[in-house]
Regions:
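Short amphipathic alpha helix immediately N-terminal
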Residues: 88-104
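N-terminal interaction/assembly modules
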Residues: 1-86, 125, 129, 133-142
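A general structural-boundary detector
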Residues: 82-83, 96, 114
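Short alpha-helical "recognition helix" segments of helix-turn-helix
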Residues: 108-113
Length: 142
């Protein structure tokens, strides 16, 4: 994976994290509609699928899995932010931040910096050569 591809993970991880939170919220709302079983003397099947305890156990398992996936996405985002922070100059840092964290197009980055797109692309190339990749979970010991 190139450094550029590594930095591009940020926006994907951010989108995936938002999707995961939406899935958890949708499941929470669905579970809010689960009702307790009313027991009566009437015969009924013994299908445990409708048992409230089983439903909540499945919900907890679902949420735990989603939270693991969510935390993984956050770790990727954190690692990319730390990687960008290894840029040797403030200008390189700012260009990488605008492009990969804020997701701006090259023309918008150039406008924000007040330089030409070609100049920004040149500085970006140098920044990619000089940054150090920080893997998720790695402590930043620069």
């Amino acid at each position: 994976m190139t450094k550029k591809e590594y930095l591009q993970q940020y926006r994907r991880a951010q989108l995936e994290a938002q999707i995961i939170l939406g899935e958890i919220e949708a499941e929470r709302q669905r579970m809010a509609g689960v009702r307790a079983i009313i027991y009566s003397d009437m015969p009924r099947s013994h299908d445990t699928e409708h048992d409230l305890a089983d439903a909540y156990a499945k919900y907890e398992h679902f949420v735990a899995n989603k939270l693991r996936a969510y935390n993984h996405r956050l770790a990727i985002m954190d690692a990319v932010e730390k990687t960008i922070a290894t840029a040797p100059t403030r200008l390189q840092y700012q260009i990488l931040q605008l492009r990969y964290i804020e997701g701006l197009k090259w023309d918008d980055v150039a406008e924000r910096i007040g330089k030409t797109r070609q100049w920004v692309n040149t500085v970006h190339g140098k920044a990619l050569q000089q940054i150090r990749i920080i893997e998720p979970g790695e402590t930043d010991t620069v």
